[in-house]
């Protein structure tokens, strides 16, 4: 029998099932997998339940790729270099980025909070 699953469902499963926890919240942040860019799942015993899906183009992963490109690395292959260099940087442009570039809001509904 051939089974199909969604991209974020596979991410959540690969994080939850091998973990030592019987109950856990699983947060997935991706560039884009099918159309989801983020998702929240709750793992309880042997079951994963999706609670939230953030859709493309609202993606922290795509933003990370854009920054990777802006500093001169190749998208979809240079992100690890940016990640490796991150601890050596200074937050020189932090205020500019937060004030002028990003509008980050935490999107957690009452339903998600109650289930977790």
Give residue spans per PLM region.
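Short acidic/glycine-rich loops and adjacent helix/strand connectors
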Residues: 1-116
